[in-house]
């Protein structure tokens, strides 16, 4: 059963990485800035992966826009998601620009050979260190409208959408990359506010995948959401009726340390309801998991998990030369880059 997404150490594929990626437990990989030199090199790396690993691999990246954009040189400088509502007054224009940003991101990643960018962020508010201007808005309705438009743009290109970080990472100050944050708000407040964008998009059948937060919601469950059967099985699957794939957030992050060693983190996440597990920047941890994680094809959700994985591969193929020749790409590149520059100038002036 393929369940693990791992990372690469450099800009070329090593023989060790070919062997790791070929392991039956490995479903795919996530790319980072360290893997990127320029567009030609990245296309060659992806081609090498496809040729040398003799099975389909889900190739992913975080290309959200703003400060979380792994590939910059040669790509559209996508605006931070907060910029749409903050810098554009007309609601129709706000959603139009969000849709164009979703399309532009997905088109560029698809032309590069990537299946999936983990987007959009559905967290509310801008106070959290880890989220900040990655979120569209502090209000659920505005977040829903802008995220829906962004996803529509992604879907036009044939890229699956991943809502994150369920049930909402926006109301904690701590960064889950560095520690395990606690959200101590009452359950009613989380359900009335933070969960709304997720719930509405699930009802509209717009989310193909969801990534939970490494956050402990202490009034609801003692486990972080990424390892909580309450959040993933009871709330997400049963109450909200979500049938798509559930990714763990990176199990190499400090916020996941609450769940034990790397094998225990994977086991708990799977038992809680995750289908696919990210384990990044921990090569020894990856090897430990591949050597020790035991999964059976007789496991009740085996076939369903594999089916959910298959739904995440890109639906269309487009050449970069074809993309560059389209008027939509050219116009978007100009407008979105200008919007991001306005956003950066706006932030600089506030400081």
From Swiss-Prot:
GO terms for biological process: carbohydrate metabolic process; cell division; cell wall organization; peptidoglycan biosynthetic process; peptidoglycan turnover; regulation of cell shape. Pfam families: Glyco_hydro_3. The record marks 175 as: Important for catalytic activity. InterPro entries: Beta_hexosaminidase_bac, Glyco_hydro_3_N, Glyco_hydro_3_N_sf, Glycoside_hydrolase_SF, NagZ_Beta-hexosaminidase. GO terms for molecular function: beta-N-acetylhexosaminidase activity. Substrate binds at residues 62, 70, 134, 164-165. Pathway: Cell wall biogenesis; peptidoglycan recycling. Its EC number is 3.2.1.52. Plays a role in peptidoglycan recycling by cleaving the terminal beta-1,4-linked N-acetylglucosamine (GlcNAc) from peptide-linked peptidoglycan fragments, giving rise to free GlcNAc, anhydro-N-acetylmuramic acid and anhydro-N-acetylmuramic acid-linked peptides. Monomer. NCBIfam families: PRK05337.1. Belongs to the glycosyl hydrolase 3 family. NagZ subfamily. This is Beta-hexosaminidase. It comes from Pasteurella multocida (strain Pm70). The gene is nagZ.
